[in-house]
């Protein structure tokens, strides 16, 4: 299969499919239809079939999809066989929560290094993760060859910290700050604005009738 770029919306749905397929496997279910998958993950079946079509013939008409085969396929696509080390930059309230969580449900992702300006927690180990002073950011990123970072620092330093992280070799940033950071073209940023998401949810609750 030749590698091709798929739509971003499709790429964001792949981990959702993969996680539910693992639930089916644990329940000893051997196959699933696009309709069943649709009901479980709340994505319409036509979209699921279109998403899967980007990767060729993954199912059979009248049979559906083989659960184990799909898991093996998406495991490869999502690099689930490879451990990805992640840097946590900023160990405040949100950072601490992420540090304690540390993606225990996902065996292929882990926070392996954290950074903070607070001298009382720098050079300590919390939840099994070493916390380095922010002055060591670039050096440690380079030495540990970490390419993915979670950014949970105050907005007023977000850009400068981002610049240091990129200089240290980071290619992907999960940005929890309200600031829309600027990065080179070869660096990918995913923005997670919890306030914005909550305000959007409230808007839909107030302006859209769920019974319609």
Swiss-Prot record:
InterPro entries: CoA-bd (IPR003781), NAD(P)-bd_dom_sf (IPR036291), Rex_DNA-bd_C_dom (IPR009718), Tscrpt_rep_Rex (IPR022876), WH-like_DNA-bd_sf (IPR036388), WH_DNA-bd_sf (IPR036390)
Subcellular location: Cytoplasm
GO biological process: negative regulation of DNA-templated transcription; response to redox state
DNA-binding feature ranges: 16-55
Key word Repressor present: yes
Keywords: Cytoplasm, DNA-binding, NAD, Repressor, Transcription, Transcription regulation
One Gene Ontology cellular component annotation held by this UniProt entry: cytoplasm
Gene3D superfamilies cross-referenced by the UniProt entry: NAD(P)-binding Rossmann-like Domain (3.40.50.720), Winged helix-like DNA-binding domain superfamily/Winged helix DNA-binding domain (1.10.10.10)
Protein role: Modulates transcription in response to changes in cellular NADH/NAD(+) redox state.
Family membership noted in the UniProt record: Belongs to the transcriptional regulatory Rex family.
NCBIfam families registered for this protein in UniProt: PRK05472.1-3, PRK05472.1-5, PRK05472.2-3, PRK05472.2-4, PRK05472.2-5
Stored PANTHER family: REDOX-SENSING TRANSCRIPTIONAL REPRESSOR REX (PTHR35786), REDOX-SENSING TRANSCRIPTIONAL REPRESSOR REX 1 (PTHR35786:SF1)
UniProt name for this protein: Redox-sensing transcriptional repressor Rex
Organism: Levilactobacillus brevis (strain ATCC 367 / BCRC 12310 / CIP 105137 / JCM 1170 / LMG 11437 / NCIMB 947 / NCTC 947) (Lactobacillus brevis)
Higher taxonomy: Bacteria, Bacillati, Bacillota, Bacilli, Lactobacillales
